[in-house]
Amino acid sequence: MIRVACVGITVMDRIYYVEGLPTESGKYVARNYTEVGGGPAATAAVAAARLGAQVDFIGRVGDDDTGNSLLAELESWGVNTRYTKRYNQAKSSQSAIMVDTKGERIIINYPSPDLLPDAEWLEEIDFSQWDVVLADVRWHDGAKKAFTLARQAGVMTVLDGDITPQDISELVALSDHAAFSEPGLARLTGVKEMASALKQAQTLTNGHVYVTQGSAGCDWLENGGRQHQPAFKVDVVDTTGAGDVFHGALAVALATSGDLAESVRFASGVAALKCTRPGGRAGIPDCDQTRSFLSLFV
């Protein structure tokens, strides 16, 4: 069984389903509403667990009801939260998300300032117990410390390179695999054209670099050339968490086979199936469902 650690944030997603995304100020009425745990690393952890991995989530929550719910939900998906730190008299993080009838969304995130960025306490954790460590960029200090400890232990590192105000160059340098969103890659490199931006990112690391582009698929560099995996066409209901799910699946696939093209194809299939159901986690498939889906595109 593949052993995975996912380091980063967990937030409560409060999701409002609307006819169209707001384009101006005013009042809007949602046609449906749900609350579900979210956050890049946390949702990646759920995806990895759904795919049969043994998973630990390493992060921070407050001691409020939201924190209780976030940890309980992760545990219900088979994710171990023994290494998650709880802060006294602290609020947990949350997001408000609006999703339109095409599955596109707007996210407003509240990263709780009560959750201190210090990550020195990760020194107490034995990172050699995992096959791969995935980290998001929303807890920069945590990702840096986790990747440093993982590399010292000879453990593969996978970075979810989404957009963030901070410079993530040092995290990219510590990554064996850095998979960026388009906004994240553009923010890092200052280059809007994705092919050029990907080459620029490659200069920061000896590892592999990827960029996910939604319906345009995923590109990565391998053996000096640019490779491409088209997105699978599905009836999209909700794209919330699709990128997070992709990263969790990519980590599992890379730790299992190591073949980049095969791993990207597998992760793309998992993310596509997730988009066919509402919420960031309810639609995450298991390995059998994913293989059955991929067999349709041979």
Swiss-Prot record:
Which cellular component, as a GO term, is one annotated location?
cytosol
Q: What is its EC number?
A: 2.7.1.184
Is Kinase found in the keyword set?
yes
Listed binding positions for ATP are 212, 214, 217, 243
Role noted for this protein: Phosphorylates 6-deoxy-6-sulfo-D-fructose (SF) to 6-deoxy-6-sulfo-D-fructose 1-phosphate (SFP). Cannot phosphorylate fructose 6-phosphate.
User: Per the record, what phenotype accompanies loss of this gene's function?
Assistant: Mutant fails to grow on sulfoquinovose as a sole carbon source.
Gene Ontology BP terms: 6-sulfoquinovose(1-) catabolic process; 6-sulfoquinovose(1-) catabolic process to glycerone phosphate and 3-sulfolactaldehyde; carbohydrate phosphorylation
Protein family per UniProt: Belongs to the carbohydrate kinase PfkB family.
Here the disulfide bonds are none
* Induction (record text): Induced during growth with sulfoquinovose.
Residues of the signal peptide = none
Specify the domain of life of the species encoding this protein: Bacteria
The protein's annotated catalytic reaction(s) are:
6-deoxy-6-sulfo-D-fructose + ATP = 6-deoxy-6-sulfo-D-fructose 1-phosphate + ADP + H(+)
The alphabetized UniProt keywords are: ATP-binding, Carbohydrate metabolism, Kinase, Nucleotide-binding, Transferase
Q: One MF term from GO for this chain?
A: kinase activity
InterPro entries on file: Carboh/pur_kinase_PfkB_CS, PfkB_dom, Ribo/fructo_kinase, Ribokinase-like, SF_kinase
Q: Activity regulation here? A: Strongly inhibited by ADP. Activated by sulfoquinovose (SQ), sulfolactaldehyde (SLA) and dihydroxyacetone phosphate (DHAP) (through effects on KM) and by fructose 6-phosphate (F6P), fructose bisphosphate (FBP), phosphoenolpyruvate (PEP) and citrate (through effects on kcat/KM).
Summary of subunit composition and partner proteins: Homodimer.
Please report the name of this protein according to its UniProt entry: Sulfofructose kinase
PROSITE patterns (alphabetical): PFKB_KINASES_2
